Amino acid sequence: PSERSIFMNYRCETNLREIEKYLRGADTMAFDFETAPMPAYRDDNKAALDAHRSHIVGVSLSVAEGSAIYIPLEHFDGGNADSDQVIPFLRDTLWTNPMVAKVAHNLAFESMFLYALGIIIQPPCYDTIAAAQMTLKNSFEFRGLSDSGLKKLVPELLGDELPTFEDVTSGRFFDELNSHDPETVRYACADSDYALRLYRRFNEWFDAFLPRHRWIVENVESPSAVYCGLMKYNGLLMDEPAMIRKQGECAARLLELREQIRGMIGDVDVGANAGTQAFKDYLFKELNLPVLKTTAKNAEAADDQTLTMLAEWCAEHRPELVPLFELVQEYRRWSKLKTTYIDGYLRFVNPATGRIHPDLLPLATETGRFAARNPNMQNCPRKTNDPVGIRAFILAPEGHVLVSCDFSQIELRVGAFYCRDPKMLETYRTGGDIHAATTSV
């Protein structure tokens, strides 16, 4: 299709009556936000993605393929709609209306910004990122998160090219663009228009090949995405002073361990985690220890598993070296606690909230479990392997408590549900231990 045919029905709209007219009668609406940092955070480009440090600049809406309107709310130039009128109108007409399906690409993002305004998206809703990950990208492989961006899906599935944020903004924030500039309008409108097109395309695919997946997207994954946005917005309250205090204690402990290691091996550079080439050369060339494991590039491995194997070998053949490996393993443990959990968590403490707001990804693992990133708050070390007390950094807000819950044997339980194996079902129904029942066979 020509560029004219793709973008000819996009327009900027600031009149509430015209906005209402455009949406009238539609039972499915796609929407997308453009955001920009608040004045105090303009030196951080990533702040535009943070609902605590940025604001909604405008919203685009699409009710028919090839058609969309852009409603500017907080542009410096070109004029804006009255947000005090538009936001309540869209809240009632779209976001909380049970008669309208709300479509967005990355619904968690939109949910987070609406929650900042006191609005929680109500079903029915549809996240096209979730839908993308529930479809096959080839005959044997489902799409991953990296395959599910709008700018990647549109050329692949619809054969069109979308304007990029960088091309349109040229290093500026979105609120610095003229709200009525055709390129501004084209960029903003394309996101909601193509979210709606993908919604239709994915549903056609589901209906033809995997109808159950459409049900899952509409009734499980998309509502979950809304609450992922809420959870990200709320974040985790962190004891930052305690983290800084422990950071110093860890640094002192690492220095102490490094000095003890140096007393055994001299001036060999062990680096931050005893994984340097110099240390490996010392182990395998100077000490002439056996290479028990190699890397993918056929080099000597020196990971935790390898060091454990070497320590066991030395206990039998070179017992005088066992204390060295004990020190190195202790050094690595403290190094990981400091770099991954203390230094790593401190980098993500939001200056506006004093909290960490990780991304929560419901479909990012092959097992179906949630994943988290920026940072990964799901892999806090167990207390038995944590002399620092990392989990104690996470605080309950005043008047609240933290509750730890865990599914019991969830994968096997799901397997029993689907395969209907009589013995597995009986074990669960009688409160037995499925692992004990398996090993007794």
Task: Map each language-model feature to its residues.
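Conserved beta-strand -> loop -> alpha-helix junction used to position metal-binding or nucleic-acid-contacting
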Residues: 120-137, 150-151, 431-435
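Acidic beta-strand-to-loop metal/phosphate-binding motif
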Residues: 30, 99-107, 402-404
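Conserved "right-hand" nucleotidyltransferase catalytic core of DNA-directed polymerases
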Residues: 1-74, 141-145, 153, 157, ...
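Phosphate- and divalent-cation-binding pockets in alpha/beta enzyme and binding domains
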Residues: 109-116, 282, 414
